[in-house]
């Protein structure tokens, strides 16, 4: 996962299964009971938070985008989330399969369609909007 800037404890993808640079990615997140978030979400009834599923999708999408040589070293930032839907809870022991397809990319701004599955069951989906910035500045890459 050296291609994206995220690190433990906020690196939310464990492995990339398929990659078409700039187009699509399939990655996995193994949801363990040892995740720090389960200390408070929710004790005795642990559920992996939807916002972290969205972040995992975004990190997977970042692998697809940042694997292109022209974007190497850039930092992806959320610019928006549309049509987010959470279908079923994700629980400790689940293997979350993250599928992200890039829909549009122009001048450092992009849109990806993300879906999260456990087995064949769709758990969440969203349209993710992002900006690529230089590591030293908060301005979008041009």
UniProtKB/Swiss-Prot annotation:
NCBIfam families: fabZ, PRK00006.1
Family matches, as InterPro entries: FabA_FabZ, FabZ, HotDog_dom_sf
CDD domains registered for this protein in UniProt: FabZ (cd01288)
Organism of this sequence: Symbiobacterium thermophilum (strain DSM 24528 / JCM 14929 / IAM 14863 / T)
GO cellular component assignments: cytoplasm; membrane
Reaction it catalyzes: a (3R)-hydroxyacyl-[ACP] = a (2E)-enoyl-[ACP] + H2O
Gene Ontology MF term list: (3R)-hydroxyacyl-[acyl-carrier-protein] dehydratase activity
Main location per the UniProt record: cytoplasm
Record flagged with keyword Cytoplasm: yes
Protein name: 3-hydroxyacyl-[acyl-carrier-protein] dehydratase FabZ
Active site per the UniProt annotation: 41
Lipoprotein found in the keyword field: no
Enzyme class: lyase
Family: Belongs to the thioester dehydratase family. FabZ subfamily.
Any one of the GO BP annotations: lipid A biosynthetic process
HAMAP family: FabZ
Pfam families reported for this sequence: FabA
E.C. no: 4.2.1.59
Compartments where found: Cytoplasm
Keywords for the protein's UniProt record, in alphabetical order: Cytoplasm, Lipid A biosynthesis, Lipid biosynthesis, Lipid metabolism, Lyase
Task of the protein: Involved in unsaturated fatty acids biosynthesis. Catalyzes the dehydration of short chain beta-hydroxyacyl-ACPs and long chain saturated and unsaturated beta-hydroxyacyl-ACPs.
